[in-house]
Amino acid sequence: MWLERLELQHFRNYNQLDIEFHKGLNVFLGENAQGKTNILESIYVLALTRSHRTRTDKDLLQFQEKELSISGLLHRTSGKVPLDIHLTDKGRVTKVNHLKQAKLSNYIGHMNVVLFAPEDLQLIKGAPALRRKFIDVELGQIKPLYLSDLSNYNHVLKQRNTYLKSTDKIDENFLSVLDQQLAEYGSRVIQHRIDFLKKLEEFGNRKVQEISGNREELTIEYQTSIELTDDVNLIDKFLTELEKSRKRDLFKKNTGVGPHRDDVAFFINGMNAHYASQGQHRSLVLSLKLAEIELMKEVTREYPILLLDDVMSELDNNRQIKLLETITDTIQTFITTTSLDHLHKLPDSLKIFHIESGKVTESE
């Protein structure tokens, strides 16, 4: 798949922008704070409806504006697919082929993206929430049912936490109803994640071995508060853990077990990668990003769009070369950079856009 055209209105520092892309490599060149990353962010939002840089939609609005729109013309093997997102203070409207989508899970997955940004280098050592978000973003694009189950789980989780905070006199029967719903949706979320990580480990290990010259091996472990055993139904096990945690939950007035608390651990040659060297961290994150591309290709039969946000300067020459080797005419790629000196072995066929104070000009 590839994005032919992007139109922005009142997005960040862009009042209006209409830009056509190369189906292969597109480079946004300019100094910092000129608007390079904003364009990449808009592509990400077009794919996933939310930004990777902020949780607040208002941050995406141009100063003193109350609504914004992002439109794109996507090419897939099945044909052209117009995509539209309109954001206001009342919420968001998403359209595919000019038809309004009632559910988020009906929209996400039409345009798949893999983002590699400097903050991704914190994936291994950062907080568990980063690793949960990593799974949610990638898995949500290739499995709409996961988004639906996750949304339902979060809805019941919010209900349960609100109820725990609202009263000191608990209706045990009502709480048991919430627990049953939480266990049903939560067990599905956990199983989706485990299945995804098994595939990611398979693809990721290939990349780790390529980069390390077969000296390193990757294993991935999903760490959950719900004991995973083949002989016990996951829902029943979830309910057991909720029962064990009930006294704690009543005291702290929140839910202490479930996929919202889970984590992922990465191991290189059996050693937790949290304690690996900086070079190993970077190689591992690069391997995971390359694995995401191949995994999405296997599931969707099309390569995703690759977004590289000022990450090349964070990689040494060898890792840059390994990353740029993936950039072919079959993978549309967007790169932001302050200098072409950071880029090695660029393909001959590409577009370079100069960005200055929100103005975009294409190199001749």
UniProtKB/Swiss-Prot annotation:
Q: SUPFAM superfamilies under this entry?
A: P-loop containing nucleoside triphosphate hydrolases
Q: Which UniProt keywords apply?
A: ATP-binding, Cytoplasm, DNA damage, DNA repair, DNA replication, DNA-binding, Nucleotide-binding, SOS response
Q: Does the keyword Repeat apply?
A: no
The record lists ATP as bound by G30, E31, N32, A33, Q34, G35, K36, T37
Enumerate the InterPro entries for this protein: DNA-binding_RecF, DNA-binding_RecF_CS, P-loop_NTPase, RecF/RecN/SMC_N, RecF_2
What GO terms in the biological process aspect are recorded for it? DNA replication; DNA synthesis involved in DNA repair; double-strand break repair; SOS response
Q: According to its UniProt record, where is this protein located? A: Cytoplasm
Any single Pfam family the record assigns to this protein: SMC_N
Molecular-function annotations in GO: ATP binding; single-stranded DNA binding
In which domain of life is the source organism classified?
A: Bacteria
Q: Which GO terms describe its cellular component?
A: cytoplasm
Keyword Nucleotide-binding among UniProt keywords: yes
Would you identify the family this protein belongs to, as annotated? Belongs to the RecF family.
Name the job this protein performs: The RecF protein is involved in DNA metabolism; it is required for DNA replication and normal SOS inducibility. RecF binds preferentially to single-stranded, linear DNA. It also seems to bind ATP.
Record protein name field: DNA replication and repair protein RecF
Name of the gene: recF
